[in-house]
Amino acid sequence: MPKTNRAQPGRLSSRFWRLLGASTEKNRSRSLTLVTDSSEYDDEAAGLTDEQLRKAAGLLNLEDLAESEDIPQFLAIAREAAERATGLRPFDVQLLGALRMLAGDVIEMATGEGKTLAGAIAAAGYVLAGRHVHVVTINDYLARRDAEWMGPLIEAMGLTVGWITAESSSEERRAAYGCDVTYASVNEIGFDVLRDQLVTDVADLVSPNPDVALIDEADSVLVDEALVPLVLAGTTHRETPRLEIIKLVGELEAGTDYDTDADSRNVHLTDVGARKVEKALGGIDLYSEEHVGTTLTEVNVALHAHVLLQRDVHYIVRDDAVHLINASRGRIAQLQRWPDGLQAAVEAKEGIETTETGEVLDTITVQALINRYATVCGMTGTALAAGEQLRQFYKLGVSPIPPNKPNIREDEADRVYITAAAKNDAIVEHIIEVHETGQPVLVGTRDVAESEELHERLLRRGVPAVVLNAKNDAEEAQVIAEAGKFGVVTVSTQMAGRGTDIRLGGSDEADHDRVAELGGLHVVGTGRHHTERLDNQLRGRAGRQGDPGSSVFFSSWEDDVVAANLDRNKLPMETDPETGDGRIVSPKAAGLLDHAQRVAEGRMLDVHANTWRYNQLIAQQRAIIVDRRNTLLRTATAREELAELAPKRYRELADEIPEERLETICRHIMLYHLDRGWADHLAYLADIRESIHLRALGRQNPLDEFHRLAVDAFASLAADAIEAAQQTFETANVLEDEPGLDLSKLARPTSTWTYMVNDNPLSDDTLSTLSLPGVFR
């Protein structure tokens, strides 16, 4: 069999690779050479039976991936296995992508270039090197789809593969985690980690020790979702915000009673508004010690819900429930909610019964979850724009992978208008003009409200457009699959993470040539996002695999990204008087949009960094708790410590009951009070954070104060938990007919559930780090 003739990976300068934080020149050159060398083994691999192919994979020496001489053989075996198992023969660029992930990089591969296949090959490579791999996806659908799609390839190399979704039982989860490669959403992996913190027997553990995380849509998971806390809650009774305050805030007037900043990220009472609220609540002083951490906090939360959070932008209401919208993905954020007070305030604002939230038993951010893994790598279509965050927060490099075929998509410069109204009119006319030719059009909008308004306008003009947003995301795969069909107009919210490719001519590509002759898929953006990555994700839907395509973005000086980041008085306002359409003719317009977007990205990076420093303290404290809990769960430490703390009681029980049962009792008691203390600590931290910004009134740095209070409280948590365990041990009713505390009183919550918190991203406070003292022996 002759060498496979594939397009050679493109060339990038060594300096450029170093700037990306990727591999050294030596390793980069080695990757390119290894891909080329692998073709020499294609004939040999093709001549093997399926069984021989599996055995050959198992005989590879990949223990040292950086130095192994068997990499070319591995790539040849993987290429042959992929073609047999999936019908897809990997291109050289896909093998290059797999190698860069095996080197620990995040790769950037354009939409339609085959990231899923490259990821499966990389996962197999890690396993053959003796590692265990979690392929982390952004939702359950992709986890199951990719596991079933790529499973035959992984199994063809003699390895096992499993997948996990929200419906998976504990037994199914253990079985899936026991496989060599496990596909699961970041949510489910996190929830399993949290649920394991409630078990009192090692046999009940589900989640294994983290080893390799190979992350699909890496920028979405590692950047956009990084600070989202995953939460484990248990049944309890908690007070909801007072309805009188929520109703009162709803009657306040903008500009008189409250003000917002330029980009509507913050809202605050004016002096007039504060006096109005104080009078309505019986003449209280909102800023007195009695009310500053309670009533004022309730008012601020209600004000946030009423003013800043908009229906069909930040959330939708469906089936008498508030559903949050994930802005970076354009779909409902399943199992996600705001912090309790804010969630209740929004529900009250919409006239919906407040949902039960319970008591937070444990929490972990996505960033802290991923940082548990010894090795992290990933793939996405837009890694370069997230390179700074990936380096700063994960120490990850980025490797751009050139396309298999040259990208011939034509990207037109932004069309910029003075007003949003003029822009929207121009968008409708442009879509109609293109639609009349039969060329398929994909329109990317920034939120649900905008998508529905544009959809209605198109329908009124006789354009049979299809809309896809958070309200009908169950139809996602079908709608996206047909978006490249002749004459189809699709209006969609954010395209990130929509795993279905758009093929010219429809899912069956029946009209591929006809659509290609018209110019392929035409993408229209209704405005710049706050980050270039999201714009590029939309553009990247056109021009797949060397197909023709085009894109154009429409913007206005009234768009959010401009209004918040540029001085309107310095913007060019010249338009063409002959057209009268309000379009800016200045050549500086596109450059100003780029500048506004860079400013927005810089602000978001600052917010991420500051919020990370806040969350880092909690992550450090949680790590100490987890370490202590594992020690109690897996060793005889609980029995030994209680024997030392209460020797008389211990000897009394040791004479009456078997040592194994006594050890179980000691472990149960110690774990209960440790978990109880941690839950109380989390509640305390939540209460502090609700009002910590008010410390600025006393000229204190709010988050420095948060750190001080959190560290002080954590130091006492250990002593309090041990003391409580000692008291329980000495008074518990262990022996038959013995008076004292019934151990059944230490029961765990009768029910638990998990959810994600869309934490308040509007704070941009700064904080400094404080060291954590050793709190457990």
Curated annotation (Swiss-Prot):
What SMART domains has UniProt attached to this entry? SecA_DEAD, SecA_PP_bind
Listed name of the protein: Protein translocase subunit SecA 2
How does this chain assemble? Answer: Monomer and homodimer. Part of the essential Sec protein translocation apparatus which comprises SecA, SecYEG and auxiliary proteins SecDF. Other proteins may also be involved.
Question: Record keywords: rRNA-binding included?
Answer: no
Family per record: Belongs to the SecA family.
Q: Indicate how the chain sits in the lipid bilayer.
A: Peripheral membrane protein
The cross-references to Pfam families, in alphabetical order and at most eight, read:
P-loop_SecA, SecA_DEAD, SecA_PP_bind, SecA_SW
| Function, in words | Part of the Sec protein translocase complex. Interacts with the SecYEG preprotein conducting channel. Has a central role in coupling the hydrolysis of ATP to the transfer of proteins into and across the cell membrane, serving as an ATP-driven molecular motor driving the stepwise translocation of polypeptide chains across the membrane.
Q: Which GO terms describe its cellular component?
A: cell envelope Sec protein transport complex; cytosol; plasma membrane
Top-level EC class, please? Answer: translocase
- The keyword Nucleotide-binding appears for this protein: yes
The processes (GO biological process) annotated in the record are: intracellular protein transmembrane transport; protein import; protein targeting; protein transport by the Sec complex
Taxonomic superkingdom: Bacteria
Where is ATP annotated to bind? 94, 112-116, 501
Task: Name the Enzyme Commission number(s) assigned to this protein.
Answer: 7.4.2.8
Record-level Gene Ontology MF annotations: ATP binding; protein-exporting ATPase activity
